[in-house]
Amino acid sequence: MPTVGCHTDDGVAGMTSSTERSARRPLLRRLGWSTLVLCASVVLLVGLGFLWFIRQVPLVEVTLTRDADGIVALTGGASRIADAIELLASGRGKRLLISGAYRATNSTAISRLNPEFERWVRCCVDFDRSLNTLGNAIETRQWAQSRGFRSLIVVTSSYHMPRAMAEIGHQLPGVALIPFPVVTDKLKAEPWWANGTTTKLLLSEYLKYIFTQVRIRFDPASGITTPAYGAWK
């Protein structure tokens, strides 16, 4: 007589497997939707944060209303150096630090920008060769502390100013920082969204700013809370 036990077992196993697959489908769908919602939320937060960051970037030159003990220029463009030396010459600060200067940047090279700069460079300008914004901030701290400065004018490009103020403020919490943003010609000429290169530059700087704020908050070397850039405006 033929046996049917094996066929019955196969049928039960097949039904069990089908039931398990059916039970897993809602779970997979829920996981898929949760992942989608999470990704959309992250994109939304980053987008809103970027728009906030854009609002912190000055689009016009500012007029200083106070002087400071010292001036620090974070290099990256000749206009920053020129503006910083003009501030020094007008008596806005006692001494200038050009931070992150290229090796070729010296009194002779700066004099080519304007011959009148030479006497100021020879008497009242210091240089350091730091390689990034954190290095700028550390060198600025050492320079300011060695001279007993309690207030600084910070000169850098407008899009770099939020990160520069965060880094320097973290290194020098007891020193008053006065931003002097240098607005690039591209930002003056057209809206940031009209130029792909400018948009990428601002987005890159925004992501670096986020990384800086996270690193500062978890910096084991200090428990200092650094205020957002807008607190200095």
Roles of regions detected by a PLM:
Residues 19-62:
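N-terminal type II signal-anchor transmembrane helix
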Residues 9-10:
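Acidic/polar hotspots within intrinsically disordered regions
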Residues 195-225:
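A transmembrane-helix-recognition feature enriched in membrane-embedded lipid enzymes
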Residues 53-196:
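A structural signal for short, hydrophobic/glycine-enriched beta-strand patches
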Residues 223-233:
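Hinge/cleft segment of the Venus flytrap/periplasmic-binding protein
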